[in-house]
Amino acid sequence: MEYMQAPPSSSHGNILCCTCGVPIPPNPANMCVSCLRTQVDISEGIPKQVTIHFCRQCERYLQPPGSWVQCALESRELLALCLKKLKASMSKVRLIDAGFLWTEPHSKRIKIKLTIQKEVMNGAILQQVFTVEFVVQGQMCEDCHRVEAKDFWKAVVQVRQKTVHKKTFYYLEQLILKHKLHQNTVRIKEIHEGIDFYYATKQHAQKMVDFLQCTVPCRSKASQRLISHDVHSNTYNYKSTFSVEIVPVCKDNVVCLSPRLAQSLGNMGQVCVCVRVTSSIHLIDPNTLQIAEVDGSTFWRHPFNSLCSPRQLEEFIIMDIDIIRDQRLGAGAGLKSNKHTLAEVWVQKTSEMDSSHQYHCRTFMGHLLNIGDLVLGFDFANANINDEFLNKMNPQHVPDVVLIKKSYDRMKRARKRVWKLKEMDREKDAADTDDERQYTEFLEDLEEDEMLRKNINIFRDASKIPVEESDTDDDGAPRISLAEMLEDLSLSDATGGEGADMMTD
């Protein structure tokens, strides 16, 4: 019978702790963990309670020395901000782990659990877990302090246009919303003939001025006012003002050009219709279909005014129409529009249907008009116009009527309109009873001009039910298709607030 000899087991001998005499495995300090912790505190010098400052107005935390950052509760950004407060005192230890401990949100306390390591006596590495409490104290930041002191803006952009309506500003509002240029403003105030944008920095105001110059024909002027001056550091505090003046010509305006400007544009007629305003003014001659563009610099060298306002347009009915084909322009003429059709029409005012008086004129809307259609136009024959260039024209070259656009039933168009636009939060100087009508006309312009609405965001209005074509008479009014609309999404619908937790039943 043979016996299997077990392999010898390797075992390390224990030693006694030099302080309390408890048997322990050998270590460089020759001490147990309990005695080692009583002798050495590796968290010594690290404060257990720290103060951080929080601005209640803008909900930002102070990051020394002078910057303010926005951090959500228990976020990585807030953890990094708290650890930076302890960075100087933790230079001799090694950070292993850090995490938040739950506290009541209204307790103004933030607790962080830290795990650190440090080499102690004779090369022994000791690890310790402890908690640091951060007390949140309120302190108003400089930006909010300026707001409360009513001295918060450093630059203002004053946009003005000398017109009787606000359709240009409605269009600018949509462009600003699309490009999110309103986010840097500290205040937006709507006043008569314009709107003011207030900024905390001059750079943001200059960015708005550059945007306006690329969007609409305008001219700007900058000025600044000295607020304070420090003679010791030789620093100056200025408030800057940018005055932006938009040309007083809008879509569907009838204008009379100067003879010199009309000649430089290809010998086109002096009486023209403005069909669109982008970064330049788009004009068309209703007698020849000749088109031209006038930029801002050209306009201010050769200014001209609108001969009529939207309220002065009268409604006419088409009595007869004759399309003019093979219209040839003279030598040196400019471009001719391919999107319009020249026609001769006989029209009669709807307010004078009991009489037999009719007007004869040419129009650029021959591709849209039929006998019996209603159009809006300007009556030159019975209007009292005081214009420098029109008074010097040969009366035989002044048309009796200039037709602008087709007329549709406004109530039917409003019922079919299942889309909406967003608006900026702004202060209004005084309520204008005519604002609603002007805004409705702006919506109609968007429906009629596809090029105009390509630059803005149109949202589907979920509160309106689409009207079936069979339920109402189709008068051929232009409409915006569903493919051009965006869904009006809001992040606060699902969370109950920006940055909040998802709501569940």
Curated annotation (Swiss-Prot):
Q: Which residues form a coiled coil?
A: none
Where would you find this protein in the cell? Cytoplasm; Nucleus
Annotated region (Disordered), positions in chain:
467-505
GO cellular component terms listed in the entry, alphabetical order: cytoplasm; nucleus
Provide the alphabetized UniProt keywords. Answer: Cytoplasm, Nucleus, Protein transport, Transport
Which GO biological process entries does UniProt record here?
protein transport; ribosomal large subunit export from nucleus
Instruction: Return the PANTHER family for the record.
Output: 60S RIBOSOMAL EXPORT PROTEIN NMD3, NONSENSE-MEDIATED MRNA DECAY PROTEIN 3
Quote the function comment for this protein.
Acts as an adapter for the XPO1/CRM1-mediated export of the 60S ribosomal subunit.
Record family assignment: Belongs to the NMD3 family.
Protein name in the entry: 60S ribosomal export protein NMD3
Which lineage is the organism of this entry classified under, starting from the top rank? Eukaryota, Metazoa, Chordata, Craniata, Vertebrata
Q: What is the name of the gene encoding this protein?
A: nmd3
